[in-house]
Amino acid sequence: MKRRSFLTSAAAFGAAPLFANNTPVHMPKGKAEHCIFIWLGGGMAQIDTFDPKKLGNNTDKTKVAGSLYKAIDTTVPGVQVTEHLSQTAKVMEHVTVMRTVNHHVIDEHAFATNIVHTGRMISGNVVYPSIGSIIAHERGAVGGEVPPYILIGYPNVSRGPGFLGAKAGYVYLTDTNTGPAGFSRPDFVDEKRALTREQLLAPLMARAPKESAIADYKTAQEQALSLSGPQFMRHFNLKEELAALRNAYGGEFGQRCLLSRRLVQAGVRFIEVSHNLNFMNGTGWDIHNEGYKNQHLLIQELDTALAALIRDLKDKKLLDKTLIVVGTEFGRPPEFDGRGGRGHQGTTFSMVLAGGGLNHCGAYGVSDELSKKPVENPVPLVDFHATVHAAMGIDPSKELMDGTRPVPITDGGKPVAALFG
């Protein structure tokens, strides 16, 4: 994105999101205790997944805009998804696809990823916290033996705590077989030796001013020490699960989703699960050019894992307590590029909510005939953030402190009232 275009977009976003509603509303308070945020890095094509339209054609010389896959019915009358979401179609009574999410001005992966995670444009003055860090800050962990926020994916500033500091940060892992790195003591450091090291370090840390980066580091270190050892690491042992259940979740991405359920049971408040761990332009859900040829495999992986997660949480009576979010940085237009792929689109795209004690309806909002813009119930991104916070029992209008400066959790976001009883 050119600098002039970005500045123009930033000004537009700051002025008003698409179809924003400025009337005061009552802030509902949901009952969800946990949030699993599934991240589809690269830009999921809503028209090929959760918002199917008429069939298009991307192989002929004269291409026809539309969906690549056939639409199928779901358990919610009148709500359809594409054929590669056949398992999710069977549990849609627990799901609401927000089909009219928009941020309108974003057309670049890094900026869009940041805005979907923080609800705000990048600022030169403020590092805004991510949605995971805000929930971790406001709700904390359910139990003292786990952190409030775990990221299954590579660390990134867009997922970070921003001005909230290290205490609202995440513990991350990239391998479901080993769990987070650095939380098990080396064999040569027994409990006595570890205690001696802590005692030697304590006087140095005590001298640090309370309001300093060192104090933040101290807080993070204390948490790390409290998590070290087998008590915390046992939550990452997927071998404790029945083989049939592990198989139901599918491959590595599915195992990450299974791990997220175990972390919910352990008391972790917010878990982000990355589908493709190390997203690079042109990979994963970034389906430019020939990228579309593997898109059906990505959708099938998502379908298998998402449906299994919903069923598993329901079986364990955790679904009403656990809000599942499926997010992506933007959607895709109905038109095809020269080699059959799709470009970027922020004017309308789909995000998914499941469980969490919400009043689900299969789909909310209606896009136009080719899913290019909203025609009913538009959901500006700031309202989507407000809906997630409200579902987690957090007031999205509450002010957090950046030093002495109050910053509201959302910029005037209003929860979608239809989802709350």
Feature map (PLM): residue ranges:
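Ligand-binding pockets and gating/stacking loops
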Residues: 1-421
